Amino acid sequence: MSFYNHKEIEPKWQGYWAEHHTFKTGTDASKPKFYALDMFPYPSGAGLHVGHPEGYTATDILSRYKRAQGYNVLHPMGWDAFGLPAEQYAMDTGNDPAEFTAENIANFKRQINALGFSYDWDREVNTTDPNYYKWTQWIFTKLYEKGLAYEAEVPVNWVEELGTAIANEEVLPDGTSERGGYPVVRKPMRQWMLKITAYAERLLNDLDELDWSESIKDMQRNWIGKSTGANVTFKVKGTDKEFTVFTTRPDTLFGATFTVLAPEHELVDAITSSEQAEAVADYKHQASLKSDLVRTDLAKEKTGVWTGAYAINPVNGKEMPIWIADYVLASYGTGAVMAVPAHDQRDWEFAKQFDLPIVEVLEGGNVEEAAYTEDGLHVNSDFLDGLNKEDAIAKIVAYLEEKGCGQEKVTYRLRDWLFSRQRYWGEPIPIIHWEDGTSTAVPETELPLVLPVTKDIRPSGTGESPLANLTDWLEVTREDGVKGRRETNTMPQWAGSSWYYLRYIDPHNTEKLADEDLLKQWLPVDIYVGGAEHAVLHLLYARFWHKFLYDLGVVPTKEPFQKLFNQGMILGTSYRDHRGALVTTDKVEKRDGSFFHVETGEELEQAPAKMSKSLKNVVNPDDVVEQYGADTLRVYEMFMGPLDASIAWSEEGLEGSRKFLDRVYRLITSKEILAENNGALDKAYNETVKAVTEQIESLKFNTAIAQLMVFVNAANKEDKLYIDYAKGFIQLIAPFAPHLAEELWQTVAETGESISYVAWPTWDESKLVEDEIEIVVQIKGKVRAKLMVAKDLSREELQEIALADEKVKAEIDGKEIVKVISVPNKLVNIVVK
């Protein structure tokens, strides 16, 4: 057989690995550790697509490489299995979401195993397993005990069709829900919040210690959004009311000519005049129908309504009209802003639209034409005139503090985490509300609080979750006869994924979240690979919970993930007609290298696009494995380009990777293997070992594979292959194409053992040195020959070799040699006449 028979070889080795528990996590405490973590998937009904294995293959290469280097390797997989899609499916079909989820997990697991990943399945976790979410609930009770989990009446993004509130991040720019595209309205509801803001400074500062890309760190820094400035208190004219504004530029107070409150601000109704009441009420209603993203869009037309009230500017006593406008959010800052239209473009546009005064307080621009947003010396600012920004801020803050109408303040863009969902398919929040007005956490001895099985998982209609319909579960009575009601909100999908990497370390522990000694052994995670779409929320939430657990003494490290890597996206192919309209792939045929619409015959333009069901361009890994084999898929996805690049899927590239593996198979099975080294491949082999080792370490898998190809080309030029080089090469390719490597290993090693723990090959630095070098031979300054000669020959030896060359002899035949100039390792120049 002169080709790699993947249909026979791959299932054979997958069966071997499963039977022998080949990838069981090592426990030898004398060995170094390596913890390689994938972002665990949500097991959807669609199964894996070819984008999933890209990151999984990367961590698998590292895991196999580290095992061969003698590390204990923890390389686990599990399921982020709570969430809306399963619940939506259950409501649509009447089936139990647990059954749907179990079927999907079985399918995902089958697909993952078919790709030959070296997971330790003894450590599999599932966020919907009560033995797992017992500890999710335990973490919540600890947060509650420390005052970091609390209830609040907050405006939420309510989606009537989904029957739940959703997070800001789940609202699309057009004001509809990410899931389903339903209308989103703002309405106040009782919600559970987690006080992530208490950790804002630590979440910000500790980023500096992490081996993450600067772009991801910057996204987190921007999300946390630290601002230093001042709180300024404004009194409302003719009342005893006042409100506070946070500003990063208190030095521009003399230019503040009006103030703007969020429509939801608590003062609005109290200060609105009777003449303006109807307009204000109407505006508040309109604002409630818009998402925060829509409201704060810089490009949208400015809208607002005057309340009829005035604020008093604390530095000059001037009256400032108080407006409401939807671009101010109640959830951000204090829900109120002081408007300085001369030096803020949004305020300037608002002032122009509603004919409000514009007062310049920083020199350098023409504020009649546009807001001047650069720095300049202060003008029209009384005791700040002539000062620069830093000096003016210091002086105005001192003035405000002395007068009792302001103080220095640090704020964060980060808001507390809205932690409740009005859905069934999530972890029950372990809290009981008693009729005497108190609330208590469910005792640890009664955890897990198990999600009751029910077919009635429609939204309750009251804004509560479907759990409110289950009175047997809902209603409880204390020993003293006091009646209570369980919390009906469930946790968001983020909960189970905020700590799963800890449970992998000790997944069967019934006494605690995980054993302290094991946590010390394995933390932090050495490398975490996943999509950049989780750059902010999941990573921020996991870091928050980890820091909280660190404060409790549960985990030994301040940070969970030492190194983070975001793989790129594998794009599909799209086709467009002359109008630019997309054509689904089932309506496209290929002829003579071009693409045509099967119905109209029109030639189409091909371009990369995100894989989607609607375009029918999703590639299923099952089909690839069936036709080409898992090792081909693995090698192709790693060879496509840099791991962090987004690259289009190519059938031709897949075929190229398959041909390479066939060449590898033929090289080892057809070439004569020698016990003695003839030295012919010394340099090529040692270069390959060094390059592949270094490139795996730096996650440059595409260049590592390119180097393996270089070696195959070099080896194919030789008649025979040295046994140690054959073995070493098989070890080098094993992390990329493990099934092929296992099969070939059996042909060169007599042990019958798996290649998985055979020591990684080393290289001989002395064999990397060039022992030959190319020199040029010039005659009268023109290059006439290029010769390969031994390195470091003397001038005399070089001259002798050059003059003996047949080509050179022909050139100088019949001519007199005047002089020969030899430069070792470079050239020989012959002067003739």
Curated annotation (Swiss-Prot):
Family: Belongs to the class-I aminoacyl-tRNA synthetase family.
Taxonomic superkingdom: Bacteria
SUPFAM superfamilies named in the record: Anticodon-binding domain of a subclass of class I aminoacyl-tRNA synthetases, Nucleotidylyl transferase, ValRS/IleRS/LeuRS editing domain
Motif 'KMSKS' region mapped to chain: 610-614
HAMAP family: Leu_tRNA_synth_B (MF_00049_B)
Enzyme class: ligase
GO BP of this protein: leucyl-tRNA aminoacylation
Assigned EC number: 6.1.1.4
Gene: leuS
Molecular function GO terms recorded: aminoacyl-tRNA deacylase activity; ATP binding; leucine-tRNA ligase activity
Residues given in the record as ATP binding sites: K613
Alphabetized UniProt keyword annotations: Aminoacyl-tRNA synthetase, ATP-binding, Cytoplasm, Ligase, Nucleotide-binding, Protein biosynthesis
InterPro entries named in the record: aa-tRNA-synth_I_CS, aa-tRNA-synth_Ia, Leu-tRNA-ligase, Leu_tRNA-synth_edit, M/V/L/I-tRNA-synth_anticd-bd, Methionyl/Leucyl_tRNA_Synth, Rossmann-like_a/b/a_fold, tRNAsynth_Ia_anticodon-bd
Subcellular location: Cytoplasm
Motif, 'HIGH' region: chain positions: 41-52
Reaction(s) catalysed (UniProt annotation): tRNA(Leu) + L-leucine + ATP = L-leucyl-tRNA(Leu) + AMP + diphosphate
Name the UniProt record assigns to this protein: Leucine--tRNA ligase
Organism: Streptococcus pneumoniae (strain Taiwan19F-14)
GO cellular component, one term: cytosol
